[in-house]
Amino acid sequence: MENGIYAKFNTGKGSILVKLTHDLTPGTVGNFVALAEGNMENKVKPQGQKFYDGLTFHRVIPDFMIQGGCPKGTGTGDPGYKFDDEFHPSLKHDRPGVLAMANSGPASNGSQFYITHVPTSWLDGKHTVFGHVIEGQDVVDAVAQGDNLDSVEIIRVGEEAQNWNAIEAFVGLKGARLKRDAA
């Protein structure tokens, strides 16, 4: 694997390996990684417990996407906080296997994510893209509604990735909003 930060989604249908875009969307990746590793304070699971492990893919639309990350399993749950969108011009819904944040409108990101089956350009500028599938798109295509997300394993390759601090990256995104709101 190339240097970088990866998320391995382990399901009963197999594994999905995603390269995360921590260099382009650091706050969003910081939130995801910190939740996955159990380091993010939230209102659902105690700190130290991995947030995504044992959740389900609560929404699956064939030929569109699979969605997970809802602690209630209904699409209405979140970690007890919301955060800003983080768009980057080079990150588009331009292929199958795009990992992005599910939301209910601007600045309503929490823990829910989706992975696409096909290009979905109408979602550009509405949902933060923060990774791409590099192995296991066949697993994405096989996941059915209600399937378990057994675990999410974060893999760090290279010195920069090893030293990257997910919490600091997320706090930086929140800090940027506070500065913008104060201006």
Give names to the regions the model predicted.
Residues 1-183:
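Cyclophilin-like peptidyl-prolyl cis-trans isomerases
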